[in-house]
């Protein structure tokens, strides 16, 4: 299986036949010694594992061939860190490697076997310091990657060291600037003396100001005045104003005449409407106000007038109809038997009954009127005419 990893032929392998060449050089800077027999094996691994014939020097020494085969098996295709390439004469090896089995070279010659075992002894001495047991820590930091200033700060806690506070661009008083935005106890505004405010501010000298004084100073550039300005007097009581015409000081509105002099509301309106100054006899001490009528009374009167007109309109129609019926009934009732004056009040009373809502026709009693038996046709014609007129009046209503 590992025959392809055989050592390649090298012109300098004959120089390593002597056991003296396996000794560690006193002035070498490498911590361990690598046998020259491994260098060709590593070169053959890096060259693509090409098969090559075994040289006659290694064929005569079966111990070296078995050692090279055992060493090459440690660097298989699945190894994550293949060895670096070195020249054939190099003596440096970058990492520690476990020694091979002691029985691998048992069949070799005495001189070759003792030389290989002697070469393994220096390697065993340097293998222990290079290996780091599990659970241990490094004794010192890496000076090539970590500067001395930062390495000293790593020994402290995550927030207690000088790294956090030594960063550039950070002010050491950022905590006080942050806390000044919150209301604190024992503070007093240097301008107005306020002890409580939603937001404490500072002026240019660092003194505390309340929110109102701080905003006033920020917007206007001066201190906030402590005395409140007096309220503006009303127009009716402005100091120093007097009407030029009537010399009054009480008015609801100050006006100006054509010359620009102040006048009261009454004198100004009189001059505007009439074109002449207001007479002094019309001056009043009290201000006259308008007597406005409430809107509810006007609405109530308007609604009552409309209801009256609506109720009067049906009666007018009924009266016209009744007058027409009376004018037609009077000539028919006039006869030589019945006197006229006695018939007129009766007809008017019947007309009033016909206007009532429950009576739709005229009723005549036979004992009130004496009609001859020889003339029944006029009475029958009168009743038919009265019924027709009553129906017409009902239809019109």
UniProtKB/Swiss-Prot annotation:
One of the protein's GO biological processes: cellular response to hydrogen peroxide
Effect upon mutating residue 203 to E: In CHTD5; uncertain significance; decreased transcriptional activity
Annotated effect of mutating residue 207 to R: In CHTD5; decreased transcriptional activity
Region Disordered, annotated ranges: 48-116, 281-356
Effect of residue 274 to R: In CHTD5; uncertain significance
Residue intervals of every GATA-type zinc finger in the record: 189-213, 243-267
Phenotype when changing residue 200 to G: In CHTD5; decreased transcriptional activity
InterPro entries (UniProt xref): GATA_N (IPR008013), TF_GATA_4/5/6 (IPR016375), Transcription_factor_GATA (IPR039355), Znf_GATA (IPR000679), Znf_NHR/GATA (IPR013088)
Extent of Basic residues compositional bias: 289-298
Disorder cited: Congenital heart defects, multiple types, 5: A disorder characterized by congenital developmental abnormalities involving structures of the heart. Common defects include transposition of the great arteries, aortic stenosis, atrial septal defect, ventricular septal defect, pulmonic stenosis, patent ductus arteriosus, and tetralogy of Fallot. Some patients also have cardiac arrhythmias, which may be due to the anatomic defect itself or to surgical interventions. CHTD5 inheritance can be autosomal dominant or recessive.
The protein, known as: Transcription factor GATA-5
Gene that this sequence comes from: GATA5
């Amino acid at each position: 299986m590992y025959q392809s990893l055989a050592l390649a032929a090298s012109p300098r392998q004959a120089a390593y036949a002597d056991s003296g060449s396996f000794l560690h050089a006193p002035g070498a800077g490498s911590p361990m010694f690598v046998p020259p027999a491994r260098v060709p094996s590593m070169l053959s691994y890096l060259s693509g594992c090409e098969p090559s014939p075994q040289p006659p020097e290694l064929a005569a020494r079966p111990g070296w061939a078995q050692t090279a085969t055992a060493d090459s098996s440690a660097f298989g295709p699945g190894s994550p860190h293949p060895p670096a390439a070195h020249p054939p004469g190099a003596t440096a090896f970058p990492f520690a490697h476990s020694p091979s089995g002691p029985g691998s070279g048992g069949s070799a010659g005495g001189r070759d076997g003792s030389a290989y075992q002697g070469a393994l002894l220096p390697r065993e001495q340097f293998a222990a310091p290079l290996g780091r047991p599990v659970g241990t820590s490094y004794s010192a930091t890496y000076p090539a990657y970590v500067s001395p200033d930062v390495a000293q700060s790593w020994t402290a806690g995550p927030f207690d060291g000088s790294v956090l506070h030594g960063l550039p661009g950070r002010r050491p008083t950022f905590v006080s600037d942050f806390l000044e935005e919150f209301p604190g106890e024992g503070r007093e505004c240097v301008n107005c003396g306020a002890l409580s405010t939603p937001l404490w501010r500072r002026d240019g000298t660092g003194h505390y100001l309340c929110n109102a004084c701080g905003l006033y100073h920020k917007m206007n550039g001066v201190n906030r005045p402590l005395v409140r300005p007096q309220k503006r007097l009303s127009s009716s009581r402005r100091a120093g104003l007097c009407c030029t015409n009537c010399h009054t000081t009480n008015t609801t509105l100050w006006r100006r005449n054509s010359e620009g002099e102040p006048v009261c509301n009454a004198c100004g309106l009189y001059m505007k409407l009439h074109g002449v100054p207001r007479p002094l006899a019309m001056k009043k001490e009290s201000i006259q106000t308008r007597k406005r009528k409430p809107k509810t009374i006007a609405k109530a009167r308007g609604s009552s007038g409309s209801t009256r007109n609506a109720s009067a309109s049906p009666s007018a129609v009924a009266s016209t109809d009744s007058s027409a019926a009376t004018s037609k009934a009077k000539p028919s009732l006039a006869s030589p038997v019945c006197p006229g004056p006695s018939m007129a009040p009766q007809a008017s009373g019947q007309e009033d009954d016909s206007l009532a809502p429950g009576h739709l026709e005229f009723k005549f009693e036979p004992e009130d009127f004496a009609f001859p038996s020889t003339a029944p046709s006029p009475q029958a014609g009168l009743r038919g005419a009265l019924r027709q007129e009553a129906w017409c009046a009902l239809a019109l209503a």
